[in-house]
Every structure is written in structure tokens, then in C-alpha cells.
């Protein structure tokens, strides 16, 4: 494994030596690994050239952006010289929004108010989070961050999951999402 300011270069066997990063959600599009203070996200469907080009462009944009509400990509990851994912700083000691149920009511209100304000700020900048769910909203003290932001719709870089459905004229949101409770 070679790490520079902008990239991490791996060979496939390097992944065998990295611990999987345990999260509360099941990642269908990627595998997560932990390397010191970095979370490495390696996409599973790396043979889809168009998808990977779109993701790489999005990572390039996000790396140079200053969206404080996002856990931003730090490095692009290449495996055997092909774009394979990205790294981001580990948001140490954070919890997902799924853990909010155990907090006092005033803390819940504070966290959810901040989430709402952060979403408003993101939407004002014409960014739509493509994978917005409780597992991708992290908090630590009074800091709220959105994870898994490579699925966002940013300008002409569309949400990977929903862009085709959103191009239809008549959209029924219950047909876009597979779980009605996510809406």
C-alpha cells in the first residue's frame, strides 16, 4: 500500500490485511476497511466503467469542496492502477442517528434540528443526498456529519441509485424507494 497526498495505491491482496470496518448497516455497493484513522470505501461493482467514471468525477469534486456537513473523501483509491474507491477520515467516537432513541428528549431535538439545518444548507447548494438514511447521519457531541456522500446528486453528477428513476416525468416516490419507511 502506497499513500500520497491525493491517492492510495493498492494491489488486491492488500485488502486481505486490512480489518473490515464494522458499521450498523449492510453495505451492498461497497466494502469498508479501517486503516489507522482512515476509512477506505472499496466499490464492489468496479467493472461498470460508466458508473466508476461518474463516481471518480464526483470524488474529484468532493475532495476539493468545502462542505462542512459531509465526511469528505481524502484520497482516491486505486487497485492495480484502476479507480476503486476513496478514503475519508474516521469520524472517531461518532454514532449513527439510529442511536438517538436512547438520548434525552432535549438532546434528540438538538440533534434533529441540526440535521434539518444541515440538510437545508446542502439543498440550498443544489446538492441532493442519494442515500440519506439514519446509518449515514453521524453525530459526536454537537457535530453532525453526513457519510456515504458519493451517492449525492451534484450538478450533472447524478445519484447513482435514483438518477434513472428521476428522469421519468411522473415520479411516485414509493416506487423509487424499496422501503416506504425511508421516506
Where are these regions (language model features)?
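Juxta-kinase regulatory segment immediately upstream of eukaryotic protein kinase catalytic domains
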Residues: 1-21
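ATP-binding glycine-rich loop module of kinase domains
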Residues: 19-76, 100-101
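Hydrophobic residues embedded in beta-strands of well-ordered beta-sheets
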Residues: 39, 84, 143-144
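Activation loop
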Residues: 176-183
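Conserved alphaE helix
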Residues: 107-121
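Catalytic-loop of the protein kinase fold
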Residues: 119, 123-140
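Activation segment/activation loop of eukaryotic-type protein kinase catalytic domains
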Residues: 133-170
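Conserved structural core of kinase catalytic domains
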Residues: 70-111
Amino acid at each position: 500500500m502506497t499513500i500520497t497526498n491525493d491517492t492510495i495505491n493498492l494491489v488486491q491482496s492488500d485488502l486481505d490485511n486490512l480489518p473490515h470496518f464494522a458499521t450498523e448497516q449492510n453495505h451492498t455497493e461497497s466494502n469498508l476497511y479501517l486503516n489507522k484513522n482512515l476509512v477506505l470505501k472499496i466499490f464492489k461493482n468496479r467493472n461498470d466503467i460508466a458508473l466508476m467514471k461518474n463516481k471518480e468525477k464526483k470524488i474529484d469534486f468532493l475532495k476539493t469542496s468545502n462542505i462542512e456537513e459531509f465526511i469528505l473523501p481524502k484520497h482516491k483509491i486505486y487497485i492495480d492502477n484502476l479507480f476503486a474507491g476513496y478514503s475519508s477520515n474516521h469520524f472517531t467516537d461518532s454514532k449513527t442517528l439510529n442511536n438517538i432513541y436512547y438520548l434525552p428528549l432535549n438532546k434528540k431535538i438538538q440533534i434533529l434540528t441540526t440535521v434539518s439545518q444541515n440538510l437545508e444548507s446542502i439543498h440550498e447548494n443544489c446538492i441532493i443526498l442519494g442515500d440519506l438514511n439514519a446509518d449515514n447521519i453521524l453525530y459526536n457531541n454537537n457535530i453532525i456529519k453526513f457519510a456515504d456522500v458519493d451517492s449525492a446528486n451534484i450538478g450533472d453528477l447524478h445519484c447513482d441509485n435514483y438518477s434513472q428513476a428521476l428522469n421519468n416525468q411522473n415520479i411516485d416516490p414509493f416506487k423509487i424507494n424499496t422501503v416506504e419507511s425511508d421516506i
